[in-house]
Amino acid sequence: MKKKPIYLWVLLILSALISATSLFGMLSPLPSKEALRAAQKQVAGVSAQQLEDQLNYTYRVAESTHSIFNIALIVLSAILVVVAIVFLVRKNLQYANYTYVGYVLLAIIGSIYSYVTLQDAVQLVQDETMSLGISVVSKAVSILYIVINVLFLALVFYKMWRQQKALAEEEETEDLA
């Protein structure tokens, strides 16, 4: 390949940043309900029940980020990003692409898992308006993340197809010569 895979470098750098922040979040300790309650501020117009709902929701979300499955997803995705970068540095573009595809598929699974755990946390909220708002936002964010990952996946597949096509044309030209 004569062209440099800038698209893959950009995607991998973004993915490395995301993986690093996820690892940092995973390594931070799970806050206690008391610590979360102390950090809560009393806002005018917000009932005690809404504050308690927010506390329960926040704690459940924090618990889900420290679950074994989520930790496995984060560690595996970080490993895949590092492996893809190593392949890219060693100029093994095909393996770098395949590894990045694996990372994106894992990210889609992670987005679906996050959505499911957020919906579980929404069940703790008793205020219907607050519950509806949280539910809608979590659906929108999950859909957005999945769409972005599918676009990244489409870009990588398109580039892989173009690379294979260029390689086939190059081989055909060599056969004719």
Which sequence ranges carry the predicted segments?
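Cytosolic juxtamembrane helix and N-cap/initiation of the first transmembrane helix
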Residues: 1-38, 155-164, 175-177
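Membrane-water interface of alpha-helical transmembrane segments
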Residues: 1-12, 60-70, 90-97, 132-142
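Interfacial non-cytosolic loop connecting adjacent transmembrane helices
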Residues: 33-67, 113-141
